[in-house]
């Protein structure tokens, strides 16, 4: 298995899919990393040369991933808790977080589906 950012990525998968195994790198960023490194995303990781892997590692270092990203997310949540933001209050009350209206199915009863009844 190849190592990128101290994470072992699967050898038998395509490079663009393997990079998504790293926390903080999704499909879009994986494609961007491969494009910047001039590496074909359809190649399997085991087919990549050491030079290509080095270029991928260098490009991936530019992004916030794994522990740093998790730490940043936790700090953002703590900051919201300290200032007692509306979102945190809604989280604590276990209600809708983004001020959308709740589904009133409990009051209305189960959804009636008339599509399958004979006409």
From Swiss-Prot:
Return the Pfam families for the record. Ribosomal_S13
List UniProt keywords, sorted A-Z: Ribonucleoprotein, Ribosomal protein, RNA-binding, rRNA-binding, tRNA-binding
Q: Which GO terms describe its molecular function?
A: rRNA binding; structural constituent of ribosome; tRNA binding
- InterPro entries in the cross-refs: Rbsml_uS13_C, Ribosomal_uS13, Ribosomal_uS13-like_H2TH
Bias kind Basic residues: ranges:
92-110
Q: Can you name a GO cellular component term?
A: cytosol
Presence of the UniProt keyword Cytoplasm in the record: no
The region called Disordered is annotated at 92-119
The entry's function note states:
Located at the top of the head of the 30S subunit, it contacts several helices of the 16S rRNA. In the 70S ribosome it contacts the 23S rRNA (bridge B1a) and protein L5 of the 50S subunit (bridge B1b), connecting the 2 subunits; these bridges are implicated in subunit movement. Contacts the tRNAs in the A and P-sites.
| Protein family membership | Belongs to the universal ribosomal protein uS13 family.
Protein name per Swiss-Prot or TrEMBL: Small ribosomal subunit protein uS13
**Annotated source species:** Mycoplasma sp
């Amino acid at each position: 298995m190849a190592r990128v950012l101290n994470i072992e990525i699967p050898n038998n998968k395509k490079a663009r899919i393997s990079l998504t195994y790293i926390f903080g790198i999704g499909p879009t960023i994986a494609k961007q990393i491969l494009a910047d490194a001039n590496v074909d995303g359809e190649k399997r990781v085991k087919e990549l040369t050491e030079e290509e892997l080095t270029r991928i590692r260098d490009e991936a270092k530019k992004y916030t991933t794994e522990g740093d990203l998790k730490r940043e997310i936790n700090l953002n949540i703590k900051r919201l808790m300290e200032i007692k933001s509306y979102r945190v209050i809604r989280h604590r009350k276990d209600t809708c977080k983004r001020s959308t209206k709740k589904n009133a199915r409990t009051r209305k009863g189960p959804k009636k589906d008339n599509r399958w009844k004979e006409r």
